[in-house]
């Protein structure tokens, strides 16, 4: 695959972590290409810089970090030098992020399906009725039980594995080109991990979405 074929192209990326007194190299000379439909696994111990690299693939850095060298290109767009407005326009619509803790990512005061509908409504991609219909279809594709009604529950009313799949459905709501999965199964038991991983793999293949899967667990 050439760089021209890639949806995401990272070249010689260098990121430093900064404090008042020190500067530490966190990401050193990393290059990779990712095309639509591919899943790239980032594996390493805690503190190895996996999540930092995942954020950089979206054009973002953690607080206290700085991109000091290299390039990150998404579908021809230079994310390192992109304006905040350009990044905001891409995030949620063409680039999505699935965090480690689904429980912390959902608002406990709102029903799951209402939160699912926010992104397509914000980006003007669908009406509320269409967004809810699509949510139910995604719940079904992700093998959530009772897909017609589970979205009308509050986050605390479903299991951890179900909530993690609901968050994956929410990330897919705008049919993004790229999804970053940042250790989405860490808090789940082994059986539930397998269910979530199978569901993620299937839906990524169905929509030919590029994905970066971050984990510290080699078995995953």
Give residue spans per PLM region.
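A short, proline-enriched helix->beta-strand linker immediately N-terminal to the Walker B motif
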Residues: 173-177
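Conserved ABC ATPase signature
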Residues: 153-158, 162
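Catalytic Walker B motif of ABC-type/P-loop ATPase nucleotide-binding domains
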Residues: 179-182
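The feature captures the beta-strand-to-loop junction immediately N-terminal to the Walker
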Residues: 43-44
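Helical segment within the ABC ATPase nucleotide-binding domain
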Residues: 194-208
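Conserved ABC transporter NBD signature motif
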Residues: 66-78
